[in-house]
Amino acid sequence: PDSGFFANSALNLEYRQGPELPTLKYGFPDSHFICFPYETRRTGIYSAGCVKRPMETAKVLDDAAGAAMKAIQCSELTAEGKAVHPRAGDMTYPEFNMNRCTQCKRCTEECPFGAINEDEKANPLPNPTRCRRCGICMGACPERIISFKNYSVSMIGNMIKSVNVPEEDEEKPRVICLICENDALPALDMAGIKRMKWSPYVRFVPMRCLGSMNLVWIADSLSRGIDGILLMGCRHGDDYQCHFMKGSELANTRLSKVSETLDRLALESDRVKFVEVGITDYDKIPQIVDDFMKTIDEVGPNPYKGW
């Protein structure tokens, strides 16, 4: 959460979330310092030197040069209509079908980068130059009006629908794993390279960020007879590793509301599980998958299988 350290405005940014850089702890700007050491939650603004953390003069000079290079890179990519890190070069952007918008403000409130403002009627006003193409707004929208040309609710939904669901008499479970492409998917790749083994009944569906998860995917999967949904996302919390700052945390928050869907379908809550996976946790992937498969074996097949 924002520490709220800055009492006086210095930057006077015109963002819905306020005029300053969001801070995390001790008044320093919020950022994913492991992978993007100069990044802030304001696209095109990079922190350096003692603005970022305490450091000596020599280090400040090197740090300032690094931040300047990132600013040049951002200017060049933005001029070409491309996204900056972590999806550098992506030329897609969120498109809104305003005919179905209910002005719920969830997209404007949940975007970690302030890429969506509001007009006087609470309609979303996207700013593509601020957008990181994470898809968090897409996952937040209950009406599913937000999409990208190469990434949408219907596109992932069709991927899930194409997964073969074994018949009940085959006695083979089917589990879908929604996996973040930033940390969890590379960890899965490394586990595969090292020839590690896990259950063959799991099908992995990569996502830009787990924060782009829309709850309709879980409802549709379970109603089709999928036995379980496993979600693998970045670590969140005070020492978060989410490349899009809040995506993994938001996915976990949304998942806490999925119990209503499970109750409506008369299904067990154990059929849906969220797991935090770091990029170095490749050796834990087989155990994570196999433990979840044991849980699915205990609760039994989905009663909607074969309908």
Question: PLM features: what roles do these ranges have?
Answer:
Residues 212-222:
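Thiamine diphosphate
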Residues 243-250:
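Alpha-helix N-cap and loop-to-helix initiation/capping positions
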Residues 53-54, 209-214, 277-285:
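A short acidic, often aromatic-flanked loop/helix-cap motif at beta-alpha or helix-coil junctions
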Residues 188-190, 241-243, 285-287:
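A short acidic (Asp/Glu
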Residues 181-196:
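Redox- and metal-dependent alpha/beta enzyme cores, enriched for Fe-S-associated oxidoreductases
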Residues 1-174, 185, 198-210, 227-230, ...:
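Residues forming the flavin
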Residues 269-307:
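Divalent-metal-activated hydrolytic enzyme cores
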